[in-house]
Amino acid sequence: MRKTMVIPTYWSRRSGEPWQEGDAIYDHPTPVDQEGTLERTLVSMKRFREKDFKLVILVCPTTEDVEEAALAQVRRIVLRSGLGAETYLFSAGDLREIAGILRGAGLDERALRLLSMYGYANVRNVCLLAASILTADAALLIDDDEVFEMDDYVQRAMEFIGRRVYGDVVHGVAGYYLNSKNQYYDDVKPEPWMTYWDRFGSKGEAFDRIIGSGPRLKRTPFAFGGAMTLHRELFECVPFDPLVPRGEDVDY
């Protein structure tokens, strides 16, 4: 089964330069004059026993003003990491070029608006587009601030994909993250406002119910975009909702 791992990485204006109207908003984009966490993620991938996958680094700037600087910074980081996997950089300029080709082929403007790196849902959809372009049978979606500790991560992520389990074919699976205490809860410092909006408590309760109970593979009402594997039959038919700018804040 052909596999493509896609890692979106988010880059903002230089340190000290304020956010400007129209800039995309992400949790923690890295200023283009800093290193960020991407290299740490790539270096941790060296422990994989299996590197039989194509890697796409999706360079997502918060503004067109930093596109070139972000791409240059990511290129330096990838070369320095020395991962040894077949790696592609996918930039906003590449996406515009693809949009131009599709426009010339007759794709209407409404559909072309979906080709955007602005906002989390659009970024995730471009991740799926990259996997489709590389004819992947499975897309492994990862975040740029993760550290891999299991050398068999790829095998685990692919274990059930395309197989029939409990009478149904598995077209998508999602994993979870461990915090600094080796727990699956959010690693957050308690704040007074949490007394009145206990979203982390609600998430913890949901995590206990889904992650903390057997069996290992089960249906779930939520998933983590940065620990997700999707089969081609799913990701070429079902996109992320482009009208939802975020994911984790939708409902508690």
Segments the model singles out, each with a brief description of its role:
Residues E233-L234:
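Short, well-ordered alpha-helical scaffold segment located
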Residues D168-E191:
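Short beta-strand-to-loop element that shapes/binds the nucleotide-sugar donor at the catalytic cleft/hinge
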Residues A70, V74-A130, L134:
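Active-site-proximal specificity loops/subdomain of glycosyltransferases
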Residues R209-T229:
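A recurrent flexible, glycine/aromatic-enriched loop bordering the glycosyltransferase active site
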Residues E149-G172:
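Conserved donor-nucleotide/metal-binding helix-loop-beta segment in metal-dependent transferases, i.e.
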Residues P245-Y252:
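Acidic donor-binding loop at a coil-to-helix junction in glycosyltransferase catalytic cores
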Residues M1-Q73:
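N-proximal low-complexity "stem/linker" segments adjacent to membrane-targeting elements
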Residues A136-E149:
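Short beta-strand-to-loop acidic/aromatic patch adjacent to the donor-nucleotide binding site
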